[in-house]
Amino acid sequence: VALGYKYRLSIVVFFLSFTYIELMDKTTYLNHYYFISLVSFLLVFLPAHRNFSLDVSRGVVTSTSKIQVIYINVIKLQLGIVYFFAGIAKINYVWIFNAQPLKLWLSSKVHLPIIGWVLRYKVTAYIFSWFGMLFDTTIPFFLAFKRTMPYAYIVVVIFHLTTGVLFPIGVFQLVMILGTTIFFPASFHEKVINRLSNLFRYSRRISVLGNAPKTHMIFFVAFFCVQVLIPLRYLMMPGNVFWSEQGYRFSWRVMLMEKAGDITFFIQDGDRKHMVANYEYLTPQQEKMMSTQPDMILQFVRFLEKEFKAKGFEDPKITARS
């Protein structure tokens, strides 16, 4: 995909394979995996191979110096949705007024050199909580304006490097630091392409891409309507989203809570009793996540019911101790 070799086929294969692996086990769900799936899906429709690619070198497509702004803006909008809804999710009593879970997390990082002593103070957790909320809700807008964009990007880099040191959560920080360069002016990207072209002695045949198909425009509008509605679906569901977790996933609720627990299941059918060893059915990661998430507990109980009926239990009653 990065080299632009058989781009359309490559990005479709990447999107399908990455998303399949991501969705195969819900206990491995991470917001940045979901983000990568969404961006790779959008890239299926974008002419990302029309400049500085092997497809251009092979003559499969002609190089273009300009594309429609809609193809740039869809990536900007997707990034903005991630940040904005992550910030909106932080506007809750526990995050704002209790500084949790940051108070808990930061207290475990006091051993770090240079910054560890600052993390000892309770006020630090409140500063981090408020800044994190304000950063997420406002940074897309500061990045979108030319005057504030350079300063906003510096804040993006500092923010994600800091969170990367304190909370290493995989590739998320790197993805966001690199991804937000899409807000840079076109002249910056042109300079980068020109220097790389000279370095690799890459010759470009320049043309201008035509208008974006109306079908693309309609699709993007529908796509982002769904992207806005999905994070809000919890409003239509009963109960507290932090307890039930209904509507929690796919909603950009990034690092909002800390849960830990254990649960043991008991099967009874008349005089027959059995205590379930969770590890016989689940990996350590699956058992850890299942123990604290209601929908996974219910799913595992339904699995156990089928499992023990297959073993001869006629009417298994399943209870839990947690």
State where each predicted segment sits.
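Membrane-interfacial catalytic/cofactor-binding modules of polytopic membrane enzymes
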Residues: 76-135
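Membrane-water interface signatures at transmembrane helix termini and the short loops
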Residues: 124-186, 243
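Internal/C-terminal transmembrane anchor helices
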Residues: 207-237
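Membrane-interface helix caps and helix-loop-helix hairpins in membrane proteins
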Residues: 23-33, 120-123, 163-172
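Extracytosolic and intramembrane catalytic regions of membrane-associated proteins
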Residues: 245-322
